[in-house]
Amino acid sequence: MSSPTQEKLTLMRYIELLEEDDLVVSRPSASYDQRIEFATDDSRQVRPGTLFVCKGRAFKCEYLLSAIADGAVAYVSKVDYDVDLPAVIVSDIRRTLAVVADVFYGHPSGKVKVCAFTGTKGKSTCSFYLRGILANEAKLTGCHRPALNTGIEFDDGIEAGPSKLTTPESFLLQSRIAHAAEAGAPWLVMEASSQGLKYERTGKIAFEVGAFTNIGEDHISPIEHPTLEDYFASKLKIFSQSRFAVVNLDMDKVDRVLEAASRCERTVTFSLTDERADVLALAIRNGDCGVVATVRTPRFTRDIVIPTPVKFNVSNALAALACAEALGISEEGIVHGFEGVFVPGRMELYPSVSGKILGIVDFAHNGMSLETLLRDLRENYPERELAVVFGATGGKGVDRRTTMGIAAGKYADRIVITEDDPGPEDVEDICAEIARNVQAQGNDNWQIVTDRVAAIETAVRETVRPAVVIVTGKGEEERMLRKNGPEPCERDGSILKRTLAAYDA
């Protein structure tokens, strides 16, 4: 992460700003006019003049000693370590991280219009759609392209690459917003995960628009959210730091969402069916280049072509359009903003040469996403066998084994259950639990193939033509989390493409 270009502040100024948020428990007795040249929570990045933040349940004193050896001039921590270095002891290290990162990078969200999506499903697709609209607007107006930070990839105007987290930690996230400002990007589009909101990774970021797209049961576990209420409340936090709100009137618990959004200057609503919505889909039909939606907004009514074979993405498109409406983007910028938008690992199509099999790779990794996806595919391809390959994560989100099993059992003709980041658990046990929920729907056409490559091959080889074979859960990912940690794995799309070529008959 690079250093910001603005004037460096003193240690005392950092302390004063932390005190404004009532975070300081104790501070150095002397007045320190030492200028802070760098700030980080990663001991490997420390350089002379660094303010080092001690973070995490797994933090070890040796990390602090390493930071001191490399030139740290002070540290911030919940714990007072017995070291010869000025210490700022705080009550909440997560909130402190957000403050220090925001201060060090010069409050970059005040220089870029940051637009954030939260929701159980569709955050990445919404982000790419809005990025497409804003990129089109940039071409029309001659300004810099928008920046992007999603769970798939990031492009902050200076650096770009694959992402490791949906919403990264405060220092990395603030550095990307700072890069966007430095590059001259007017907007940055990002995903705000429930974990990112709950644990203050997004703290101190001023969102120009905060969008809440949907809510379902997911990420409920001892290491994520203990209850659905905690999960929901974490997502609602997005409005506490947003200027404008965007809300889906079709979502569950919408009254509470609208109440939380009422603190914002303006709320723009969208819906597939509710006439009260500011942005409404009047009609939806399949077209030659995707789904065509006739959309009514406060300023115009137009047909919009969304490059997707399934209708559920219309809701994601409406969310992006509603954000664009809140931002005041032009009609032409919006209407043509979806053209050519490609979301990696989401509804990637791999038709076989013979046309007998349509292969699809998608990221659907919870029951809500999988049910919506399979239901739409069943409607679109009623004459084809619908085969699905999927698994569920280990060590977290255990409810997915139930909800995904139920969804597959209800809608799929052929089911191959396999591994999907089993982590600390035995993949066989996870698959067996999914299978019980599939069978509970009266669906007996399932099998367990724990090796993911073999599972995809099995689905393609055994499906009855004509068929749709959909592989879900991993998308663009190239690593599998197993007991010994992350291991390299082949992309689902690569496996599917190769397998279709081998078994296309």
Regions found by a protein language model. Give the residues of each.
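Short, well-ordered alpha-helix to beta-strand connector turns
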Residues: 36, 48-49, 72, 84-85, ...
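Short loop/edge segments at beta-strand edges and connector loops
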Residues: 77, 91, 150, 192, ...
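Phosphate-binding loop of NTP-binding sites
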Residues: 97-249, 253-266, 381
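Acidic, Mg2+-coordinating active-site environments of NTP-dependent enzymes
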Residues: 81-84, 181-183, 198, 208-359, ...
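Short, ordered loop/turn segments at secondary-structure junctions
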Residues: 79-81, 151-152, 215, 272, ...
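ATP-dependent carboxylate-amine ligase
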Residues: 1-23, 48-51, 57-59, 115, ...
